[in-house]
C-alpha cells in the first residue's frame, strides 16, 4: 500500500523527499492545476536547514538565496531594540533567505514526477482495518497505509480529522512584497516596530529585497477592503517612521510583487485520526512573527518519516503528535506574543514596550534562541 500526501507545498514536498529516501511508495496530489508557490520571500533558520539537510544539498540550496546571520529589531525612530541570530552560537551556518519559488524548485528537484498529480484532491476517506480507502476527484480509489494532510491553513483533509477546528484572527493584516534593492549589510534582516504596525525587510537575492508590512485591524473576518491597497497607499501608512524604517518605506512603491493576507493561527488538539495525519499549517498554522512556520513543517516531515519507517501503524501518529505538540505550542505562543507587542499603539504603551524589550537580559534571549533553534534535526544528531 502507498502513502498518500495531499498538498504540494513545503510540508508535502519535504515529506515526499523523506519517503523517497526511505524507499517508501508515495503519491502526492495537489488540488491546484499547477504547483505554484503562493508568496514572496521566506527565511529558513538553522533548525529548518538541519531538517532539510536530510534530503537536500545545503550548499546548492544556499546558491539559490542569501545567507542570513540574524535580524535587528528597531523602534520607529530608528533606534535599536534588540538583535536576534538565525542559528545557535555553535552552528556552522546561519540562516537562509530566498524566494519561495526557489525553495519549491529545490524540493521538487529529483522527485519522481509520475507520483505527483495536479488538479486532483481527496473527496472521501473511509476507514479500513489496516488502511484508509481514499477516493480522489479524478475517480480513482486507493488503499493507503497512511494519508497525510499537508494542504495548508485552509486544509480540506482537516475537516475529516478535526471538523470543529477554527482559525483565530491575530488582529493584524499583512502585505508581502519584493522590491529591487540591495541592503548595505545584506546578511542582516530588520524589523521596525511602530504604533500598531511593523515593517520588515530581508535580502533574498543579490538584487531583490523581501519586505513585509503589518497593520493592526479591528475585525475578526479576514480579507476585506484592507486587501485592496496599492504600494503607494501602503507606503503612506509608514510615513511616521524615521531612520532605516523611513528608508524601507520609500522603497515600497517600487514593488514588483504584492501579496496580501490576514495573519491567523490554528491551535487545538487533534492532528490525527486512524491512519490520517495533519502536518505543517494544516495541523498548527501560526503567525509568522518568529519566521518559524516553514521550519515547523520541515521538522514535522523529518520526524513523521522516521517514526513511520520504524512503526507503520496508526498508533505512531499519536506518538508523532505527542513528540511535536509541546514544541509547536511554545513557538506558536511566542509568535503570538510578538505580534501582540507589535500592535501596541498609544505613545505610552509603545514607550513601555520598547523600554521593556531593551531591558530583557541577554541570558534570557539566549535561552529563547536555544529553544527555537534546537529542532528535531538537531535532537536526532545528538
Swiss-Prot record:
GO biological-process terms attached to the record: quorum sensing
Query: Which top-rank group of organisms is this from?
Result: Bacteria
What catalytic reaction does the record list? 2-heptyl-4(1H)-quinolone + NADH + O2 + H(+) = 2-heptyl-3-hydroxy-4(1H)-quinolone + NAD(+) + H2O
Top enzyme category: oxidoreductase
- Keyword terms, alphabetized: Monooxygenase, NAD, Oxidoreductase, Quorum sensing
EC numbers listed for it are 1.14.13.182
- Annotated signal sequence is none
Per its UniProt record, what SUPFAM superfamilies does this chain match? FAD/NAD(P)-binding domain
Induction comment: By LasR.
Tell me, in a sentence or two, what this protein's role is: Involved in the terminal step of the biosynthesis of quinolone which in addition to serve as a potent signal for quorum sensing, chelates iron and promotes the formation of membrane vesicles (MVs). Catalyzes the hydroxylation of 2-heptyl-4-quinolone (C7-HHQ) to yield 2-heptyl-3-hydroxy-4-quinolone (PQS). PqsH is also able to hydroxylate HHQ analogs having alkyl side-chain lengths of 3 (C3-HHQ), 5 (C5-HHQ) and 9 (C9-HHQ) carbons, however catalytic efficiencies are significantly reduced for substrates with alkyl side-chain lengths below 7 carbons.
Q: Which family does it belong to?
A: Belongs to the 3-hydroxybenzoate 6-hydroxylase family.
Leftover remarks: Oxygen is essential for PQS production and anaerobic P.aeruginosa produces undetectable levels of MVs and display reduced killing of prokaryotic and eukaryotic cells.
Q: What is this protein called?
A: 2-heptyl-3-hydroxy-4(1H)-quinolone synthase
What is the protein's species of origin?
A: Pseudomonas aeruginosa (strain UCBPP-PA14)
Primary gene name: pqsH
Amino acid at each position: 500500500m502507498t502513502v498518500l500526501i495531499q498538498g504540494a507545498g513545503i510540508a508535502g514536498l519535504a515529506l515526499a523527499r523523506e519517503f523517497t529516501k526511505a524507499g517508501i511508495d508515495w503519491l502526492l496530489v495537489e488540488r491546484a492545476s499547477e504547483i505554484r508557490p503562493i508568496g514572496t520571500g521566506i527565511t529558513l533558520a538553522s533548525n529548518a536547514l538541519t531538517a532539510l539537510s536530510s534530503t537536500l544539498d545545503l550548499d546548492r540550496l544556499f546558491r539559490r538565496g542569501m545567507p542570513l546571520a540574524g535580524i535587528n529589531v528597531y523602534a520607529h525612530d530608528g533606534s535599536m531594540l534588540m538583535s536576534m541570530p538565525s542559528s545557535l552560537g555553535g552552528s556552522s551556518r546561519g540562516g537562509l533567505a530566498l524566494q519561495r519559488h526557489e525553495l519549491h524548485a529545490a524540493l521538487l528537484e529529483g522527485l519522481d514526477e509520475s507520483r505527483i498529480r495536479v488538479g486532483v484532491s481527496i473527496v472521501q476517506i473511509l476507514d479500513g482495518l489496516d488502511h484508509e480507502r481514499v477516493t480522489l476527484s479524478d475517480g480513482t480509489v486507493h488503499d493507503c497505509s497512511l494519508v497525510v494532510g499537508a494542504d495548508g491553513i485552509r486544509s480540506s483533509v482537516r475537516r475529516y480529522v478535526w471538523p470543529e477546528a477554527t482559525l483565530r484572527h491575530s488582529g493584524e493584516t499583512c502585505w508581502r512584497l519584493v522590491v529591487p534593492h540591495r541592503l548595505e549589510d545584506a546578511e542582516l534582516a530588520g524589523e521596525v516596530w511602530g504604533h500598531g504596525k511593523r515593517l520588515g525587510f530581508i535580502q533574498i537575492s543579490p538584487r531583490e529585497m523581501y519586505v513585509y508590512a503589518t497593520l493592526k485591524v479591528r475585525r475578526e473576518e479576514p480579507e476585506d477592503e484592507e486587501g485592496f491597497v496599492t504600494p503607494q497607499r501602503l507606503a503612506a501608512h509608514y510615513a511616521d517612521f524615521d531612520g532605516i524604517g523611513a528608508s524601507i518605506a520609500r522603497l515600497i512603491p517600487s514593488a514588483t510583487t504584492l501579496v496580501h493576507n490576514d495573519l491567523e493561527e490554528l491551535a487545538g488538539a487533534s492532528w490525527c485520526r486512524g491512519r490520517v495525519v495533519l502536518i505543517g499549517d494544516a495541523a498548527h498554522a501560526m503567525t509568522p512573527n518568529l519566521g518559524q512556520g516553514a521550519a515547523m513543517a520541515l521538522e514535522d516531515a523529518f520526524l513523521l518519516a522516521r517514526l513511520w519507517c520504524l512503526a507503520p501503524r496508526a498508533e505512531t501518529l499519536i506518538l508523532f503528535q505527542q513528540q511535536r505538540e509541546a514544541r509547536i505550542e511554545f513557538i506558536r505562543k511566542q509568535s503570538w506574543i510578538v505580534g501582540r507587542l507589535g500592535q501596541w499603539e498609544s505613545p505610552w504603551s509603545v514607550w513601555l514596550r520598547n523600554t521593556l524589550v531593551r531591558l530583557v537580559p541577554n541570558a534570557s534571549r539566549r535561552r529563547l534562541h536555544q529553544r527555537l533553534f534546537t529542532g528535531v534535526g538537531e535532537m536526532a544528531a545528538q
